[in-house]
Amino acid sequence: MATQEEVDQGREAELLLSNPTYQSAWNDLRDDLTRDWRKSDPGDQDARERCYVAITLLDKLQDKMGEYMNAGRLASDVFDKERR
């Protein structure tokens, strides 16, 4: 059963993901981390792993926000059908 919380969370996620400031910050951060990873000394395994972990977490955050957005859309559709 869909909840209002899912609908609200989905809307908030969509607002965040579509926010130009958030998009710029996310892209800049990912670009910075990728650049740091590429520029790191091949022997500096710790630095390379830290960059890899940070990029992976950043991508997972984006994926999770997308999941919230999609779940909210589905919940909203369920509410709409229940009202008919």
Could you say what each language-model-derived stretch is?
Residues 2-36:
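N-terminal acidic leader/helix
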Residues 3, 44, 74-75:
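Serine/threonine-rich low-complexity intrinsically disordered regions
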Residues 9, 45, 78-81:
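Short linear motifs in intrinsically disordered/low-complexity regions
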Residues 15, 47, 72:
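Residue-level signal for functionally critical sites in structured catalytic/ligand-binding pockets
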Residues 22-66:
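Amphipathic, hydrophobic secondary-structure cores in small proteins
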Residues 55-84:
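Charged low-complexity stretches with an acidic bias
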